[in-house]
Amino acid sequence: ILTLTASLFAVLAPAQNLISSGSPLYKLPYKNTYVMQTLVAENTFRTAKVEKPKPGTFEQARKVLPSPYWEGHQKEIEMYWKAWQIGLKNVCQPLDDSGFVTSYISPAYNGNIFMWDDAFITMFCRYGDRFFPFQKTLDNFYAKQHPDGFICREIRADGSDCFGRYDPTSTGPNLLPWSEWLYYTQFGDDNRLNKVFPVLAAYYKWLKLNRT
């Protein structure tokens, strides 16, 4: 998916990023072994200002969200609305000094953000984009990208990675481009695509180097 995206869109002009690999942000317990990925310098999420939007009530959301019609399947429709109700209750505010840059939906069980979970939930939540910017949930992963392009698949609410980048369990299937591509095909948001492209390209290069 990322290869397809890369073939369709040009990389933006570099944007300056001043977070060094020696920053306390990464809390390295070992010698600095980062091999710098130049595309990370274009990752504007790493130095973005924090935003903390709050969603409205479920009653307000129901007036905006798509209302399904499925004759003879009232129970399924009730489940649909219940899913939205639960989802809105799981929108969290970023903690101070966590390095997260925006409010996010957190469907996980332990307060952490999971790359897989949030990739899939944003695929669903894009239908509620007029009510709340759910897609920005993924911005918090991008904000935590390491200087070599690595992004941990699970990150605690305080912003710390759950796994070191040399741990083979620190990554999984790269679902981020899938979510972003679906969002783009629905909304045609060129600005967002241009912002996430260098981030995803840097992560793809890290995966290619370290997981193949």
PLM feature segments, named:
Residues 2, 101-103, 108, 174, ...:
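Short, well-ordered helical secondary-structure segments
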Residues 2-11:
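Bacterial N-terminal signal peptides
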Residues 8, 101-102, 162, 173:
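Hydrophobic alpha-helical segments with strong N-terminal bias
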Residues 10-14, 90, 94, 184-186:
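Hydrophobic alpha-helical elements and their junctions with loops/disorder across both membrane
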Residues 16-111, 136:
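Low-complexity, Ser/Thr/Pro/Gly-enriched N-terminal "stalk/linker" regions
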Residues 111-212:
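Aromatic-rich carbohydrate-recognition surfaces in CAZymes
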